[in-house]
Amino acid sequence: SIAAYWYRKAAEQGNARAQYNLANRYKKGEGVTQDYSLAFYWYQKAAKQGHEMAQYNLGRCYMEGKGVEKDVEEAKAWISRSAKKGYDKAIEYKKKQGW
């Protein structure tokens, strides 16, 4: 899709928001073929730049083993980073998991 094309262009130039949006498209298969490995790749790029929603989603990838081998400790670390930044979904998820 046109949107995916422009997200990719911006993502490749290091735009964290575009990386996050592109990852979501790969996760859901919106305008691109669904690919959890590519979703993980782009979430990781954005998460390393401090994007709190990407950090949460990267943690969920690790928790569920989607696009990457399951790793609960990595999941906890990324979701905790997101929660520290005040991201509601991460805070709720941590409470639900009893972390």
What residue ranges belong to the model's regions?
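TPR/TPR-like alpha-solenoid signature
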Residues: 20, 41, 56, 76-77, ...
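Short helix-capping/linker turns of helical repeat alpha-solenoids
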Residues: 7, 12-15, 28-30, 35, ...
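Hydrophobic face of amphipathic alpha-helices that form TPR/SEL1-like repeat modules
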Residues: 21-28, 57-64, 93-99
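Asparagine/serine/threonine-enriched low-complexity, disordered tracts
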Residues: 9-12, 21, 45, 57
